[in-house]
Amino acid sequence: MVPISDSIVKQSIDFYGEDLESTVCMEECAELIQAISKQKRCKSDKEHLTEEIADVLICIKLLQSIYDISDGHIADWIISKQARMLERIKGE
């Protein structure tokens, strides 16, 4: 995956402000939800879905910066959540 530029993230937050960027991130998540819904209804537009995923990935970095959340902290949660997923899969 292409790395997301911390410098551009910082510039964007400095320019637009934390409040607006947080709101935009909520909107981008909603747009991804809508794109997934359309994909499920067999209205295949993989390019649009991919674009919305990219937007949300950028937003994750924005939110990490705004709320001071490290990659390591997220990694810890990912490990925990995937272990729980595996337990559920094996339990069924």
Residue ranges and their predicted role:
Residues 1-53, 57-92:
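Flexible "arm" and connector segments at domain edges
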